[in-house]
């Protein structure tokens, strides 16, 4: 990996950037941003798909598969955390003396050009909260630059390049990526054990988030969830002042008051330092989304946005792509898709789903990575015993090889009545067989489980 300070000399018009893993959720928007800055952009990915097709429509060439020849005459390489040193493009670049930078280094360098860098982190809730903040700052007419790890309907993509002085960036802890950022406002939603293929344990994860908070300069702000034990532990004794948000703890600077639930959707007042700030009516359900809204509102307050902008922005937010996203109806059963791939995210999703007026919850779950499934096995079992019916797809490998001999079959043995499906086609068939009018069908996971739901809906037609 090349030193981050060196990347600034490469992010100039006319330079040619090769992005290895260009179709990824934060790589494809990076490709577009660099393209918009006047760089020549090319890349490669193991899989074709909508993001790759979109990049090609912009005139960005994308090769499928990784090979040293893909580098062409590029000036530098940017890679995702999933692209390792033994990848032929990385080893080829090293052999030729072409500098290799991490994706986070590129985003960090871009971030340095903004007065306000709002970086939103947490084990889960990052995409939703970043999307909420985007709605608020757009309502406040701040014209922000945005990088989200998902698709936001407001933007019709996962990014935008604004002309304002604020950048809003989803900030991931995996491989300490967010430590390459330059936050002026660092938001920490929650801290739990995850990415245990990289981190040793929860204490290691907490240490990473603490280092992230310590990046905030004097005059900046650390915003954190007082209701989350991991966040409190990570920040205990830190020198930076902390702006806490909470559902109802009076010790927090920001909290919700007068919460009313109507058909599973919350409306509430936001009080900051004891004074009324904003009224919010959310169009997404779940207590976790109240917390996400409080986090986004806290950041907006600290950066000078009005309470009116907060209320208006959040009133128009209907969810981010793959976050309880309505896909359609199959013989009277509603089909939703969600990105949840950690037990904490599953818990929040299923708790929210239980408040909705469906006869049964059918959850088609695809675990994401072998190491996460093994490390959090008992937690997954606990959460997957909540739905009325569970259909288990095989584990989505992502960046891993199955060297530990684990399978979704192992989960199925611990979940009474569950159905194990080795292929997505079998998941679709199982859902078609099981579903009844009035059911809620959830396709859940960070891999390609959504395809099973989409195929189910095609069968309806």
Residue ranges and their predicted role:
Residues 1-102, 106, 229, 257, ...:
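N-terminal leader/targeting and accessory segments in enzymes
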Residues 381-437:
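C-terminal helical cap/extension that packs against the catalytic core
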């Amino acid at each position: 990996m090349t030193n981050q300070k060196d990347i600034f000399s490469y992010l100039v018009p006319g330079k040619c950037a090769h992005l290895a893993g260009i179709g990824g959720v934060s790589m494809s928007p990076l490709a577009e941003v660099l393209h918009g800055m006047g760089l020549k952009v090319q890349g490669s990915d193991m899989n074709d798909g909508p993001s790759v097709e979109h990049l090609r429509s912009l005139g960005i060439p994308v090769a499928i598969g990784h090979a040293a020849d893909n580098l062409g005459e590029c000036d530098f390489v940017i890679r995702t955390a999933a692209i390792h040193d033994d990848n032929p493009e990385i080893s080829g670049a090293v052999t030729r003396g072409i500098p290799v930078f991490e994706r986070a280094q590129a985003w960090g360098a871009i971030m340095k050009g903004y007065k306000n860098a709002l970086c939103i982190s947490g084990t889960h809730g990052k995409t939703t909260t970043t999307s909420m903040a985007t709605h608020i700052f757009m309502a406040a007419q701040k014209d922000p630059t945005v990088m989200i790890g998902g698709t936001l309907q407001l933007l019709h993509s996962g990014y935008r390049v604004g002309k304002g002085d604020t950048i809003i960036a989803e900030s991931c802890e995996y491989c300490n990526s967010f430590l390459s950022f330059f936050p002026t406002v660092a938001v920490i939603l929650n801290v739990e054990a995850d990415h245990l293929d990289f981190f040793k344990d929860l204490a290691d994860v907490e240490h990473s988030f603490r280092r992230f908070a310590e990046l905030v300069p004097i005059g900046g702000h650390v915003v954190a969830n007082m209701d989350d034990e991991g966040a409190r532990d990570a920040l205990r004794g830190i020198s930076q002042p902390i702006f806490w948000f909470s559902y109802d703890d009076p010790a927090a600077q920001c909290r919700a008051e007068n919460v009313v639930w109507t058909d599973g959707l919350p409306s509430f007042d936001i009080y900051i330092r004891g004074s009324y700030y904003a009224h919010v009516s959310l169009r997404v359900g779940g207590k976790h989304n109240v917390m996400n809204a409080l986090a986004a509102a806290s950041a907006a307050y600290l950066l000078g946005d009005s309470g009116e902008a907060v209320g208006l922005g959040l009133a128009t937010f209907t969810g981010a792509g793959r976050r309880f996203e309505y896909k359609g109806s199959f013989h009277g059963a509603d089909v939703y898709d969600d990105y949840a791939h950690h037990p904490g995210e599953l818990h929040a999703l299923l708790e929210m789903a239980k408040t909705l007026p469906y006869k049964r919850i059918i959850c088609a779950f695809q675990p994401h990575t072998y190491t996460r499934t093994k490390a959090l096995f008992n937690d997954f079992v606990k959460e997957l015993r909540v739905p009325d019916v569970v259909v288990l797809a095989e584990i989505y490998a992502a960046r891993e090889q199955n060297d530990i001999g684990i399978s979704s079959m192992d989960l199925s043995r611990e979940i009474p009545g569950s159905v194990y499906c080795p292929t997505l086609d079998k998941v679709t068939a199982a859902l078609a067989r099981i579903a009844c009018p009035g059911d809620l069908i959830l396709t859940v996971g960070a891999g390609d489980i959504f395809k099973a739901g989409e195929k189910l809906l095609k069968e309806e037609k």
